[in-house]
Amino acid sequence: MLKSSKKEDSSKKNQNNKLIFTVRKLFSPIKNFFRKTKTPDNFFGVIKRLKINSQKMTLDERNILANLLELEDKTIEDIMVPRSDIAAIKLTTNLEELSESIKLEVPHTRTLIYDGTLDNVVGFIHIKDLFKALATKQNGRLKKLIRKHIIAAPSMKLLDLLAKMRRERTHIAIVVDEYGGTDGLVTIEDLIEEIVGRIDDEHDQQLDSDNFKVINNSTIIANARVEVEVLEEIIGEKLHNDYDEFDTIGGLVLTRVSSVPAIGTRIDISENIEIEVTDATPRSLKQVKIRLKNGLNGQ
C-alpha cells in the first residue's frame, strides 16, 4: 500500500515538474521586481499588474494569479482540516504498532502524535523516520522520532502562516481554539493547493471540485467535510437546525451515532434520506453515499 508502481511514480514526477516549471515561469517577474525593491507592501501590487498584463499567460498561470490575489484575505479557518477529520496516533504506541496503523489507517507521509487526548498534540512523525528506525531495528517509543509543529490561531492569515512555516522549518500547524484545545490542522500542502489548485495523489477520492458528485437522481457521493448547507440546496430538504453544533455532513452523521461508523454502515437521516459510510478510519469519517428515496427535490 505504501509503495507506488514505477509508472505512477513517473507520471506523478512529470506532473510535479510541469507544476514547478509553471510556478517558476509565473514568479520570475515578481522575483525580478523584488530584486529592485524590498518593500513588502509592493507584493500584491505586482500581482495585480501581472494580472492586467496576463494576455500571454496560460490558463494555469492566470488561475494561479487569481488564487494569489484571493490569498491576501484568507485565514487558516478558511482551509483547515477540522478536528473530526484529524488522524493521529497515541504517544504510547510502539514503532511496530505505529507501522501497522499507518499502513491501515493513515495513508500520509506525516502523522500527528498526541499524549492522552487530541487536545495535547506533542508533534508529528515523518514516515521516512519511522522506516529508518524499523530498518535499523530501533526499539522503544515514538519520542525520539517526533518533530515539532506550529501552534496557530484560526484567524491567522495564510501568508503569515506560510512565512512562519518557512522560518521554523516545519510543515504542520495545529490550530487551537480560545481555550487551547485542538480545533484543526493545516499542512504546507494545504497552503500550496490554495495557490496552484488541488493536487490529487493516489489516496484522494475522485470527486469534483466541490468534493461531491451527483451520480443520478437518487444518489450523491460526498466528502464528509462538505457543508450540510451545500447539500441542502441540492437535495431541497433541511438536514439540520440552527442550534445544531455541526457544519459538515460528517458532523451530521456523527450526531446520530456514538462513534465513527464502520464502512458499509447505513443511517436513516429522514424518511427520504439514507446515508451510507463508504470511506472511514477508526478515528474519522471520510466519504459517504447519500441515497434519496424520493429523488432530488422529490422527483
From Swiss-Prot:
Which InterPro entries does the UniProt record give?
CBS_dom, CBS_dom_sf, FAD-bd_PCMH-like_sf, FAD-bd_PCMH_sub2, Ion_transp-like_CBS, Transptr-assoc_dom
Q: What are the protein's UniProt keywords? A: CBS domain, Repeat
Q: PROSITE patterns this protein is in?
A: CBS
Give any GO molecular function from the UniProt entry: flavin adenine dinucleotide binding
Quote the SUPFAM superfamilies the UniProt record gives: CBS-domain pair, FAD-binding/transporter-associated domain-like
CBS domain location: 80-142, 145-202
Family recorded in the similarity comment: Belongs to the UPF0053 family. Hemolysin C subfamily.
The record makes one more remark, namely:
Despite the presence of the tlyC gene, the true SFG rickettsiae are non-hemolytic.
Name of this protein: Hemolysin C homolog
